[in-house]
């Protein structure tokens, strides 16, 4: 999708501000609109009527530099992207960050022809021209919810894929697992082999891919544990297999866990944090979603 440029004809519909010193977008807006509450400013961002250098920006902590132009549309708000299984968290000329709901595939396989995050986003960007499309950078399992990033051109896709471990600084998940974790923190290392329908784990190098998961126990209650997980590698089903290795499978995981333990009717795994250096500007981008409420309830309610 091309940058959404503001035409000269429409210029009178915007209030323009020039950035004179480095600061985050929210701080800048608060200074320019002192009577507006933080909630009001976030609402303006969510309505997609804030532009930075002619690009719609919804990230409240977007880093501004001297010389940038911030524009606020006087329109009521742009028509937002709406879909029950995903939402756009951030978009610019190079990338789209989404929050995917559980149950939605990231991308089709040869055997699966259903609508996916990839096909839905392609339809969205093609509203601005049939030549536009998004490009896969990484994936989430169908039953895992959370943050994903797509590239909007092939050059950005190559940059992200070829430099993934240098560009992505933090990719974190939260899960609810069966039983109370023995350790407050630890690391799981194993070699994973993908047999299509099942990923097998070995504690020694048997020709599989070395896979490393760091974990931290947040809370134990009601026979469950709320756990944060940080991937050092990103293999297929890695977290699910590693939690099985620890003897604490993820709730709702019928493949690597217990089919009859599913109190919330879904896999209790969510990608809640994604931090990376922007592939074009080099700026550090931080995105974080709250823990799903249904996860927290499992370790809060009394039985």
Please give the residue ranges for each predicted region.
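Short glycine-rich, acidic/polar surface loops and turns
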Residues: 260-264, 272-273
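The conserved catalytic core of RNA pseudouridine synthases
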Residues: 130-161, 170, 189-190, 194-246, ...
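Thr-Gly-centered strand-to-loop micro-motif
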Residues: 52-53, 107-108, 151, 202-204, ...
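Edge beta-strands of extracellular beta-sandwich domains
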Residues: 83-85, 250-253
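RNA pseudouridine synthases
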Residues: 1-187, 191-196, 294-301
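Short, surface-exposed loop/helix-turn segments at secondary-structure junctions
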Residues: 252-261
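Conserved hydrophobic positions within beta-strands
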Residues: 88, 177, 214-217, 250
